[in-house]
Amino acid sequence: MARNFLTIALPKGKLLTDSLEVLTKIGIECQEVSEESRKLVFPLEKAQAQIIICRPTDIPTFVEYGAADIGFVGKDTLLEENKDVVELLDLGFGYCRFVVAMPEEKVPPRLPDGKFDLSGLNHQRVATKFPRVAEDFFREQGMQVLPIKLHGNIELAPRVGLAEMIVDIVSTGTTLRQNKLVEIAPILEATTRLIANRVAYRMKHERINELTERLRQLLGRAP
């Protein structure tokens, strides 16, 4: 393939629509790309590129190993997967928050500053899709926890005795409230990021930088 040919990895699911929208707005025609299609690879001849559709959690791996030159991925996934990639730009969409939550009847007391006292949660079990993020957060608090990795229905874990608390991503908090869980600590905020393979970023620097700058101007991001 030509040196400036780009393979772009996009996530299946809710981030795909926003990702395609911003690419279209910077002149990359991708009308044929659809999650409804059985295809996973979409050639874009005019743009000298192709789009591949991946599971969100796999995108950092595709980019790290060079199967994709660049990718769109949530910061939550980027932190958890901890792959060796170049983070180029905060794209701003797909906002969510990492939080610690517990059943409302088991929340710890509050400290004078209004925050919940987490000290009594040392060595407790934490159900989460993000064990690395959970461990890192509690380690920063000087605590150890036992992460239990689940792939869905995280809110169920405290109700059936699998874990004392959860670490999960939330957008509005509605699911927590419906399951009688209370947010006891914020961890961090996450949005979608543009990432690049390290070798591709050197070899295709001009092309990748051009695309990054067009996205930056579109989204009004500071350099």
Curated annotation (Swiss-Prot):
The enzyme's E.C. designation: 2.4.2.17
Entry-linked Pfam families: HisG (PF01634)
Enzymatic reactions: 1-(5-phospho-beta-D-ribosyl)-ATP + diphosphate = 5-phospho-alpha-D-ribose 1-diphosphate + ATP
**Which pathway does this chain act in?**
Amino-acid biosynthesis; L-histidine biosynthesis; L-histidine from 5-phospho-alpha-D-ribose 1-diphosphate: step 1/9
Molecular functions per Gene Ontology: ATP binding; ATP phosphoribosyltransferase activity
BP-aspect Gene Ontology terms: L-histidine biosynthetic process
Q: Where in the cell is it found?
A: Cytoplasm
Q: Name one GO cellular component term.
A: cytoplasm
Write down the top EC class of this protein: transferase
- Coiled coil located at which positions? none
UniProt keyword list: Amino-acid biosynthesis, ATP-binding, Cytoplasm, Glycosyltransferase, Histidine biosynthesis, Nucleotide-binding, Transferase
Subunit: Heteromultimer composed of HisG and HisZ subunits.
Role noted for this protein: Catalyzes the condensation of ATP and 5-phosphoribose 1-diphosphate to form N'-(5'-phosphoribosyl)-ATP (PR-ATP). Has a crucial role in the pathway because the rate of histidine biosynthesis seems to be controlled primarily by regulation of HisG enzymatic activity.
Which family is this protein grouped under? Belongs to the ATP phosphoribosyltransferase family. Short subfamily.
Q: What is known of its domains?
A: Lacks the C-terminal regulatory region which is replaced by HisZ.
PANTHER family listed in its UniProt record: ATP PHOSPHORIBOSYLTRANSFERASE, ATP PHOSPHORIBOSYLTRANSFERASE ATP-PRTASE
Q: What is this protein called?
A: ATP phosphoribosyltransferase
Which source organism?
Answer: Desulfitobacterium hafniense (strain DSM 10664 / DCB-2)
Q: Its gene?
A: hisG
